Amino acid sequence: MNNNEQELAEFWDEFAEEYEEIQQESPYPIARELRDFLVQEGIFPCQTFLDIAGGTGRYLPFFQEQVTEYTLADISQRMLEIAEAKAQSNVVFLHQSQERLIETGKKFQVVFSAMNPALDTPEKVNALCQLSEEWCLIFRLVEEQDSLFSPFEQESNPQLNWMAQYKAFLKKEQRPFFTKKFFFEASEAISKDFFRSYFEEQWSVPILEQRVQEIFGSHEIKQNQHTIIYELIAIPCKKTTSDD
Protein backbone atom coordinates (compact mmCIF):
# COMPACT_ATOMS: atom_id res chain seq x y z
CA MET A 1 0.00 0.00 0.00
CA ASN A 2 1.12 3.56 -0.66
CA ASN A 3 0.92 6.22 2.07
CA ASN A 4 -2.56 7.37 1.10
CA GLU A 5 -3.91 3.83 1.09
CA GLN A 6 -2.28 3.14 4.45
CA GLU A 7 -3.97 6.20 5.95
CA LEU A 8 -7.32 5.08 4.56
CA ALA A 9 -6.81 1.58 5.94
CA GLU A 10 -6.03 2.96 9.40
CA PHE A 11 -9.10 5.22 9.32
CA TRP A 12 -11.44 2.36 8.44
CA ASP A 13 -9.77 0.03 10.94
CA GLU A 14 -10.54 2.52 13.71
CA PHE A 15 -14.11 3.02 12.48
CA ALA A 16 -14.88 -0.66 11.90
CA GLU A 17 -16.72 -1.47 15.16
CA GLU A 18 -18.84 1.67 15.02
CA TYR A 19 -19.58 1.03 11.36
CA GLU A 20 -20.79 -2.49 12.14
CA GLU A 21 -23.02 -1.20 14.94
CA ILE A 22 -24.62 1.26 12.53
CA GLN A 23 -25.25 -1.53 10.03
CA GLN A 24 -26.78 -3.78 12.68
CA GLU A 25 -29.10 -1.01 13.89
CA SER A 26 -30.55 -0.38 10.44
CA PRO A 27 -34.24 -1.37 10.36
CA TYR A 28 -34.34 -1.73 6.58
CA PRO A 29 -34.29 -5.14 4.79
CA ILE A 30 -32.00 -3.75 2.09
CA ALA A 31 -29.78 -6.78 1.52
CA ARG A 32 -32.69 -9.23 1.43
CA GLU A 33 -34.68 -7.22 -1.09
CA LEU A 34 -31.65 -6.69 -3.30
CA ARG A 35 -30.87 -10.42 -3.24
CA ASP A 36 -34.45 -11.27 -4.21
CA PHE A 37 -34.28 -8.83 -7.11
CA LEU A 38 -30.98 -10.27 -8.38
CA VAL A 39 -32.50 -13.76 -8.27
CA GLN A 40 -35.55 -12.48 -10.15
CA GLU A 41 -33.32 -10.95 -12.84
CA GLY A 42 -31.25 -14.13 -13.25
CA ILE A 43 -28.03 -12.49 -12.04
CA PHE A 44 -28.11 -14.83 -9.03
CA PRO A 45 -27.07 -17.57 -8.65
CA CYS A 46 -23.56 -17.15 -10.05
CA GLN A 47 -20.19 -18.88 -9.93
CA THR A 48 -17.72 -16.15 -8.97
CA PHE A 49 -18.69 -12.96 -7.16
CA LEU A 50 -16.60 -9.99 -6.02
CA ASP A 51 -17.93 -7.77 -3.23
CA ILE A 52 -15.47 -4.87 -3.53
CA ALA A 53 -15.19 -2.46 -0.60
CA GLY A 54 -17.37 -5.03 1.15
CA GLY A 55 -16.63 -3.67 4.62
CA THR A 56 -17.99 -5.77 7.47
CA GLY A 57 -20.08 -7.90 5.13
CA ARG A 58 -23.51 -6.34 5.24
CA TYR A 59 -24.64 -8.30 2.16
CA LEU A 60 -22.70 -11.46 2.91
CA PRO A 61 -25.38 -13.36 4.91
CA PHE A 62 -27.93 -12.87 2.12
CA PHE A 63 -25.69 -13.27 -0.93
CA GLN A 64 -23.29 -16.10 -0.07
CA GLU A 65 -25.80 -18.91 -0.60
CA GLN A 66 -26.31 -17.65 -4.17
CA VAL A 67 -22.61 -17.78 -5.01
CA THR A 68 -20.18 -20.67 -5.54
CA GLU A 69 -17.02 -18.63 -4.89
CA TYR A 70 -17.55 -15.36 -3.00
CA THR A 71 -14.64 -12.90 -2.67
CA LEU A 72 -15.01 -10.00 -0.25
CA ALA A 73 -12.32 -7.34 -0.68
CA ASP A 74 -11.66 -4.33 1.52
CA ILE A 75 -8.80 -2.00 2.38
CA SER A 76 -9.46 -2.46 6.12
CA GLN A 77 -8.18 -5.60 7.82
CA ARG A 78 -10.41 -4.97 10.84
CA MET A 79 -13.50 -4.74 8.63
CA LEU A 80 -12.60 -8.10 7.12
CA GLU A 81 -12.15 -9.67 10.55
CA ILE A 82 -15.68 -8.64 11.52
CA ALA A 83 -17.04 -9.95 8.21
CA GLU A 84 -15.36 -13.34 8.72
CA ALA A 85 -17.78 -14.14 11.54
CA LYS A 86 -20.66 -14.09 9.02
CA ALA A 87 -19.00 -16.20 6.34
CA GLN A 88 -19.55 -19.73 5.10
CA SER A 89 -16.77 -21.90 3.67
CA ASN A 90 -17.25 -20.57 0.12
CA VAL A 91 -16.08 -17.05 1.09
CA VAL A 92 -12.55 -15.73 0.55
CA PHE A 93 -11.33 -12.47 2.09
CA LEU A 94 -8.95 -10.17 0.29
CA HIS A 95 -7.12 -7.34 2.09
CA GLN A 96 -6.55 -5.04 -0.87
CA SER A 97 -7.45 -1.57 -2.11
CA GLN A 98 -9.73 -1.07 -5.08
CA GLU A 99 -6.89 0.31 -7.21
CA ARG A 100 -4.54 -2.60 -6.49
CA LEU A 101 -7.29 -5.13 -7.16
CA ILE A 102 -8.11 -3.57 -10.52
CA GLU A 103 -4.43 -3.72 -11.44
CA THR A 104 -4.35 -7.49 -10.89
CA GLY A 105 -6.66 -8.06 -13.85
CA LYS A 106 -8.58 -10.78 -12.01
CA LYS A 107 -11.99 -11.64 -13.42
CA PHE A 108 -15.26 -12.41 -11.67
CA GLN A 109 -18.61 -13.33 -13.15
CA VAL A 110 -20.35 -10.62 -11.09
CA VAL A 111 -18.73 -7.55 -9.51
CA PHE A 112 -20.73 -5.77 -6.80
CA SER A 113 -20.00 -2.53 -4.97
CA ALA A 114 -22.32 -0.93 -2.41
CA MET A 115 -21.84 2.56 -0.95
CA ASN A 116 -18.22 2.50 -2.07
CA PRO A 117 -16.46 5.76 -1.04
CA ALA A 118 -13.57 5.01 -3.41
CA LEU A 119 -15.89 5.05 -6.42
CA ASP A 120 -15.75 8.84 -6.44
CA THR A 121 -15.58 9.49 -10.19
CA PRO A 122 -17.68 8.03 -13.02
CA GLU A 123 -14.52 6.89 -14.79
CA LYS A 124 -13.83 4.49 -11.91
CA VAL A 125 -17.05 2.66 -12.75
CA ASN A 126 -15.50 1.78 -16.11
CA ALA A 127 -12.38 0.54 -14.36
CA LEU A 128 -14.49 -1.62 -12.05
CA CYS A 129 -16.22 -3.16 -15.05
CA GLN A 130 -12.85 -4.47 -16.23
CA LEU A 131 -13.00 -6.98 -13.38
CA SER A 132 -16.32 -8.41 -14.53
CA GLU A 133 -17.14 -11.09 -17.08
CA GLU A 134 -20.92 -10.66 -16.97
CA TRP A 135 -22.31 -8.00 -14.61
CA CYS A 136 -21.05 -4.96 -12.73
CA LEU A 137 -23.51 -3.89 -10.02
CA ILE A 138 -23.30 -0.48 -8.34
CA PHE A 139 -25.59 0.10 -5.35
CA ARG A 140 -25.94 3.36 -3.45
CA LEU A 141 -28.22 5.45 -1.29
CA VAL A 142 -29.69 8.21 -3.48
CA GLU A 143 -32.23 9.88 -1.19
CA GLU A 144 -32.77 10.17 2.55
CA GLN A 145 -35.50 12.22 4.21
CA ASP A 146 -37.24 12.37 7.54
CA SER A 147 -40.22 14.35 8.77
CA LEU A 148 -38.66 16.17 11.76
CA PHE A 149 -35.07 17.05 10.89
CA SER A 150 -34.75 17.17 7.10
CA PRO A 151 -37.01 20.24 6.65
CA PHE A 152 -34.54 22.31 8.70
CA GLU A 153 -31.22 20.92 7.47
CA GLN A 154 -29.60 22.77 4.58
CA GLU A 155 -26.48 20.70 3.98
CA SER A 156 -26.85 17.77 1.64
CA ASN A 157 -24.58 14.79 1.16
CA PRO A 158 -22.78 15.19 -2.21
CA GLN A 159 -22.47 11.40 -2.48
CA LEU A 160 -26.24 11.23 -3.01
CA ASN A 161 -25.57 12.66 -6.48
CA TRP A 162 -22.93 10.12 -7.49
CA MET A 163 -25.38 7.70 -9.10
CA ALA A 164 -26.71 10.43 -11.38
CA GLN A 165 -23.13 11.16 -12.42
CA TYR A 166 -22.45 7.47 -13.09
CA LYS A 167 -25.56 7.20 -15.27
CA ALA A 168 -24.74 10.35 -17.24
CA PHE A 169 -21.25 9.00 -17.89
CA LEU A 170 -22.50 5.58 -19.00
CA LYS A 171 -24.97 7.21 -21.39
CA LYS A 172 -22.21 9.40 -22.81
CA GLU A 173 -20.04 6.31 -23.30
CA GLN A 174 -23.03 4.53 -24.87
CA ARG A 175 -22.76 1.68 -22.40
CA PRO A 176 -25.97 -0.27 -21.82
CA PHE A 177 -27.30 -0.52 -18.27
CA PHE A 178 -30.53 -0.74 -16.33
CA THR A 179 -31.56 0.62 -12.95
CA LYS A 180 -33.83 -0.33 -10.11
CA LYS A 181 -34.84 1.75 -7.09
CA PHE A 182 -35.62 0.33 -3.65
CA PHE A 183 -37.85 2.29 -1.27
CA PHE A 184 -37.84 1.84 2.49
CA GLU A 185 -39.72 3.51 5.34
CA ALA A 186 -39.38 3.41 9.11
CA SER A 187 -40.49 5.40 12.13
CA GLU A 188 -38.82 6.27 15.42
CA ALA A 189 -39.90 8.18 18.51
CA ILE A 190 -38.11 11.51 19.08
CA SER A 191 -38.40 13.37 22.36
CA LYS A 192 -38.89 17.09 22.64
CA ASP A 193 -35.65 17.34 24.65
CA PHE A 194 -33.64 15.52 21.98
CA PHE A 195 -35.01 17.75 19.23
CA ARG A 196 -34.21 20.83 21.29
CA SER A 197 -30.62 19.74 22.01
CA TYR A 198 -30.07 18.78 18.36
CA PHE A 199 -30.81 22.29 17.10
CA GLU A 200 -29.78 24.42 20.08
CA GLU A 201 -26.51 25.56 18.48
CA GLN A 202 -28.16 26.39 15.15
CA TRP A 203 -31.06 28.55 16.25
CA SER A 204 -31.61 31.36 18.72
CA VAL A 205 -33.66 30.47 21.78
CA PRO A 206 -36.86 32.23 20.58
CA ILE A 207 -36.75 30.48 17.18
CA LEU A 208 -35.92 27.12 18.76
CA GLU A 209 -38.78 27.31 21.24
CA GLN A 210 -41.19 28.45 18.55
CA ARG A 211 -40.36 25.46 16.37
CA VAL A 212 -40.47 23.03 19.30
CA GLN A 213 -43.95 24.32 20.08
CA GLU A 214 -45.07 24.10 16.45
CA ILE A 215 -43.89 20.51 16.09
CA PHE A 216 -44.53 18.98 19.51
CA GLY A 217 -47.23 21.18 21.02
CA SER A 218 -48.18 19.63 24.35
CA HIS A 219 -46.65 16.25 23.45
CA GLU A 220 -43.28 15.10 24.74
CA ILE A 221 -42.78 12.55 21.96
CA LYS A 222 -43.22 12.82 18.21
CA GLN A 223 -42.87 10.09 15.58
CA ASN A 224 -40.15 10.79 13.03
CA GLN A 225 -40.94 9.21 9.67
CA HIS A 226 -37.87 8.11 7.68
CA THR A 227 -37.84 7.48 3.95
CA ILE A 228 -34.75 6.24 2.12
CA ILE A 229 -34.20 5.25 -1.49
CA TYR A 230 -31.41 3.04 -2.78
CA GLU A 231 -30.63 2.59 -6.45
CA LEU A 232 -28.98 -0.23 -8.35
CA ILE A 233 -27.13 0.28 -11.62
CA ALA A 234 -26.63 -3.03 -13.43
CA ILE A 235 -24.08 -2.91 -16.26
CA PRO A 236 -23.76 -5.94 -18.57
CA CYS A 237 -20.08 -6.67 -19.20
CA LYS A 238 -20.16 -9.65 -21.56
CA LYS A 239 -17.86 -9.15 -24.52
CA THR A 240 -19.36 -9.43 -27.97
CA THR A 241 -17.54 -10.36 -31.16
CA SER A 242 -17.21 -6.68 -32.06
CA ASP A 243 -15.39 -6.03 -28.76
CA ASP A 244 -12.52 -8.37 -29.64
PLM regions: where:
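Conserved class I S-adenosyl-L-methionine
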Residues: 1-42
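Class I SAM-dependent methyltransferase SAM/SAH-binding core
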Residues: 50, 55-100
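Short conserved loop adjoining the S-adenosyl-L-methionine
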Residues: 100-106
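A conserved beta-strand element that flanks and buttresses the S-adenosyl-L-methionine
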Residues: 112
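A short, conserved alpha-helix within the catalytic core of class I
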Residues: 118-131
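Short alpha-helix
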Residues: 158-178
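Conserved Class I S-adenosyl-L-methionine
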Residues: 178-244
